[in-house]
Regions:
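Active-site glycine-rich loops that stabilize anionic/oxyanionic intermediates
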Residues: 22, 42, 49-54
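Active-site-proximal cap/loop segments of hydrolase catalytic domains
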Residues: 47, 57-173
């Protein structure tokens, strides 16, 4: 039907559940290669941005234009984990850490994740949180941070594009 996609090893997706470090029930999406074998160990990329599990039935066209395209990664033998984050006001980095690490550990415990090959990726707000996470745990062997606010001191006086409001309001809440 679509010969241009004949060589794509399509992904399947599973809704997964775990608890955060402080016991809050969480969920996320786990994309697996079409030829997934639970007896084998796979490298895994963790990509997050607030709440992504609502995209359970979203179609991902194979494309290099996304930060992390689950179809492209799964077609190349990777697992892709999109965990939801439970935020505590004033602690965005710690909230992401306490949501993501237990989720990754729960998947590693299932036996098919190569714990020596887990990477994390984040863009913008997710990039900031990824930068925070990699300073707090040795769990991730690689990280991709796209357009993160990695220096809040220099960004403090910046202006938000959408609202025209100073960034200080984000950091002072």
């Amino acid at each position: 039907l679509n010969p241009q996609q004949a060589q794509v090893n399509w992904a399947s997706v599973e809704l997964v559940r775990w608890r955060s470090a402080d016991g809050v029930p969480l969920q996320g999406l786990l994309y697996k290669p079409e030829d997934f074998d639970p007896a084998r160990k796979y490298p895994m990329v963790v990509y997050f941005y607030e709440q992504l599990s609502d995209n359970l039935h979203q179609y991902h066209t194979p494309s290099g234009r996304n930060v992390v395209n689950p179809t492209v990664y799964a077609s190349n033998g990777y697992l892709v984990f999109l965990p939801n984050i439970h935020y505590q006001t004033g602690f965005p980095g710690e909230s992401a850490l306490e949501s993501i690490v237990p989720g990754v550990q729960a998947l590693v415990a299932r036996g098919f994740v190569d714990e020596r090959a887990v990477g994390i990726a984040g863009q913008s707000w997710g990039g900031y949180q990824s930068a925070y996470i990699i300073t707090r745990t040795p769990l991730f062997r690689a990280a991709f941070l796209g357009a993160p606010v990695a220096n809040m001191t220099s960004a403090y006086g910046g202006i938000r594009w959408e609202s025209g409001v100073a960034r200080a309001f984000q950091y002072e809440k």
